[in-house]
Design a protein with these regions (language model features):
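Short beta-strand to alpha-helix junction loop
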Residues: 70-89, 252-259, 285-297
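C-terminal active-site-capping segments
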Residues: 399-402, 406-488
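Rossmann-like dinucleotide-binding core of oxidoreductases
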Residues: 3-6, 10-11, 16, 20-41, ...
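A conserved short coil-to-beta-strand element within the FAD-binding core of flavoproteins
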Residues: 102-116, 308-323
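Feature captures the FAD/FMN-dependent oxidoreductase FAD-binding
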Residues: 75-140
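Beta1-alpha1 glycine-rich phosphate/pyrophosphate-binding loop at the start
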Residues: 4-100, 202-203, 270-276
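Glycine/threonine-rich phosphate-binding loop and adjacent beta-strand/alpha-helix elements that clamp
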Residues: 334, 338-415
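Helical element adjacent to the flavin cofactor pocket in flavoenzyme catalytic cores
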Residues: 82-100, 291-315
Length: 488
């Protein structure tokens, strides 16, 4: 495709989505893009989450870009630092740094119908123009801090898992961990061997299945590097293994749920011998309606003499520790907040003003919706990566991300080839699509309990109700007739 200097493209965010989009644009011969990243380095999730034990919970060969496969993963489930190293290498290989604006936060985006352009404003007051915006800002970015009385009264060290302070030495310290979600199941077994005492405060137990992590031997990595076919085959097998397990996680089926429960109970029994402790660690909600966690050693940590599971509700935090509602004070030298992230899909990441001055927050007042999770009526030429109802509950998020990048690239090529000002998804098409998504939600397991998946009204605007392969097929071909267009 002939390069168009008059067709600037803005990519917001330098995580997997932004980097992947930039690579595919370059491969298509489109060089007129700029990547805006609010932090001083690329990486997104894997730049920020560096707590002990941080790792992906899907196999490494699937948790990587299909067009940048890596034969050198050291283990089945890559660590945070290894994933970040992979991303840094990909950025350097494709010479993307020259097109990046690091330490540059977009604070407002405003669409101009006359020019068919988005006007972006940075935190420094600079102005940029983009004919197309690819928004890869991520849905789980900013840490969520618990609403607990006295949070600022604690005299010891306190840190969120997503903002880990590596200057704090937890060796032989009394440590409290609040939360038992995805980060807790990784950090707890990682710090348990070094601390004097570890108190884990559990509000709700989680279903945890075996991870079966393992190191890859050097000979295997050399073999995969020399014979790329087997690297692709390994990815293929791991992907379809995750897909075929998907129904256990997301379909509202009593039989499938029992299979999931059996797998989790087996994992619990092999790690914990104390029946009373097993009872306290066993959830009472349907398998899959909250995020299913993976770990080989989280539950085993509670068998250690220096690890205590606290199930009493927290009353508040005091200068010396955590007070529970039974009156007990659990003294601590450090508190780790494993309390997850603010759900970025609930609101726009910054003011986004579309056609006729309507903001994205106004469009999403009744819940975040988008056509195929990517485009929102009234916000032309704006493509969301991992938008509403595109989260996976069973496989790699990158399968969805790559499908979205491909879809956005088709739209960009159409805009350029047909000399269009903009493409704006029709409201009726968007409404019809999202009605079908919510109808399918009735057959999914996620409505069976309260979780961050659900809005206050109980609707689910986070996850995709089906297989990743199906989503890829639904997004493979751009339907121009679904869009309102305007020519110059």
């Amino acid at each position: 495709m002939q390069e168009r200097s008059d067709f600037p493209i803005a990519i917001i965010g330098a995580g997997f989505a932004g980097i992947g989009a930039a690579i595919q644009l370059k491969k298509a011969g489109i060089q007129s893009f700029t990547i805006f990243e609010r932090s001083s380095e690329i990486g997104g999730t894997w730049r920020d989450n560096t707590y002990p034990g941080a790792a992906c919970d899907v196999p490494s060969h699937v948790y990587s870009l299909s067009f940048e496969q890596n034969p050198n993963w050291s283990r089945r489930y890559a660590t945070s630092s290894e994933i970040q190293e992979y991303l840094l290498g990909v950025v350097d290989k494709h010479e993307l740094r020259e097109r990046m604006r690091l330490d540059t936060e977009i604070v407002e985006a405003r669409f101009d119908e006359e020019s068919g352009s988005w006007f972006l404003t940075t935190n420094e007051g600079e102005a940029f123009t983009g004919r197309v915006v690819i928004a890869g800002v991520g849905g789980l970015v900013d840490p969520s801090y618990p609403n607990i009385a006295g949070l600022d009264q604690f005299e010891g060290e306190m840190m969120h898992t997503a903002r880990w302070d590596h200057d704090v030495d937890l060796t032989n310290k009394r440590v409290a961990v609040i939360g038992t979600g995805a980060s807790a199941v990784q950090v707890v077994p990682s710090i348990a061997p070094i601390v004097a005492m570890l108190s884990v405060f559990q509000r709700t137990p989680a279903w945890v299945v075996g991870k079966f992590d393992a190191l890859y031997p050097n000979w295997l990595r050399r073999f995969l590097a020399r014979v790329p076919f087997f690297l692709r085959a390994s990815r293929f097998v791991k992907y379809w293994t995750s897909e075929l397990r998907g129904p256990i996680v997301f379909f509202n089926s009593r039989i499938l749920s029992r299979i999931g429960v059996a797998l989790s109970i087996w994992n619990l029994r092999r790690q914990v011998k104390d029946p009373e402790l097993r009872q306290r660690l066993t959830p009472d909600f349907q398998f899959g309606c909250k995020r299913v966690l993976v770990s080989d050693d989280y539950w085993a940590s509670f068998e250690r003499e220096n690890v205590d599971l606290v199930i009493d509700s927290i009353e508040g935090i005091e200068s010396k520790g955590i007070r529970t509602k039974d009156g007990s004070l659990h003294e601590a030298d450090a508190i780790v907040l494993a309390t997850g992230f603010k759900l970025g899909l609930a609101t726009a990441p910054f003011p986004i003003i579309g056609r006729q001055g309507r903001t994205l927050d106004e469009a999403w007042a009744g819940g975040a919706v988008a056509y195929k999770g990517m485009t929102v009526a009234g916000f032309p030429n704006w493509f969301i990566m991992m938008g509403p109802n595109t989260g996976p509950g069973h496989t790699s998020v990158l399968v969805y991300t790559e499908a979205q990048i491909s879809h956005a690239l088709q739209a960009i090529k159409t805009l350029m080839a047909e000399n269009l000002k903009y493409m704006d998804i029709r409201q009726d098409v968007q409404d019809q699509y999202n009605a079908s998504i919510q109808k399918r939600m009735k057959h999914m397991v996620w409505g069976g309990c309260k979780s961050w998946y659900l809005n206050e009204d109980g609707s689910n605007h986070s996850l995709y109700p089906g297989f990743a392969a199906e989503y890829v097929l639904r997004t493979r071909k751009l339907r121009s007739e679904d869009y309102e267009t305007a020519a110059f």
